[in-house]
Amino acid sequence: MRAIIAALLCLCACQTAASQAIPLRYGQAYSALRSIFALPLFVAEREGYFVREGLDFSMVPVPGGGERLIWALHDGTADMSHVATAFLVQAALAGSDAVAVVAEFNNPIYSLVAKPENKSYADLKGKLIGVAAETGSITASIRKLLALNGLQRDDYRTRFVDGTPDRLACLTTGDCDAVPLGQPHDFVAMRRGFRLLGLSTDAVPEYLYTVTAARRSWAAANKDTVVRYVRALASAFKFIRDSARRAEVLKTIVDTTGFSQANAELTLALYFEPDRRVLPKAGEISINGMEQAIALMGESGAIKAPLPTAERFIDLQYLQAAGIQ
């Protein structure tokens, strides 16, 4: 009888906690919802880290490009958003008070994959390359990779193709001669006979790629919520990095992205064997990584000199309050 009473009390306590959970809407691009870039969020959901922190977390699909993820913070669609640093910087320079509160991905690895007949960079001269947003860091890094291998902007044509899945389709249908692909779509393409020419990391130093952003005004008014979110995400990063949890992480990747088991294994091996610092240890923000992202934007012409300081786009108080940084 005592055991039954204890169980009922526990159930009531859990229901009360759930009813008092703080709602938190997180904006995520449609193109990233079933990608590796959503992994930390899905792990935090599946492992109950948001619930543990007293958050009623929901992921809100946001159509459009990176700019729209910032707009979602201003039009009431989302409280926080996944966003690439390039779009955050441009929005802040245009007057947004959006700021990075925790890192999601560093040092992304994009493969430049081409049709089989393109055996070298020289073979891409005059060809069509499907690229991500012109002002984004993916395109900047791929243009730099091409330049390092003898191809200047006038040597090839480009077409905007948003998202790795659509770029893979552009390649496989024959519309594009080469495209940058993230994981595991690069593995898929190579298994189909397409040719790897190089990696974005061959051309650019490590930089801060994606972050969770919030408006300064909203974050300041909801500091406890932001800190709870940061703690939950930190737990997810630690879980992903724990080799003893590898099978569970692989299952999450397969279930949420549609990757095959083999491609999920290849992706984690690429990231962690050896550790290429693609994911932060606990969501910490690298000031140097943000500086490198800004420098890359300057090199690509996305922003003009004098370049802004990294601190303008980062607010570390939430990571500090969570005991992470």
Spans of features found by a protein language model:
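Positively charged n-region of N-terminal signal peptides that target proteins for export
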Residues: M1-I4
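A bilobed periplasmic-binding-protein/Venus flytrap-type ligand-binding module shared by bacterial periplasmic
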Residues: P40, Y110-K119, Y209-D224, V278
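Surface-exposed patches in mature extracellular/periplasmic domains of secreted proteins
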Residues: M59, A100, T158, I240-A244, ...
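Secondary-structure end/capping motifs
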Residues: A220-K304
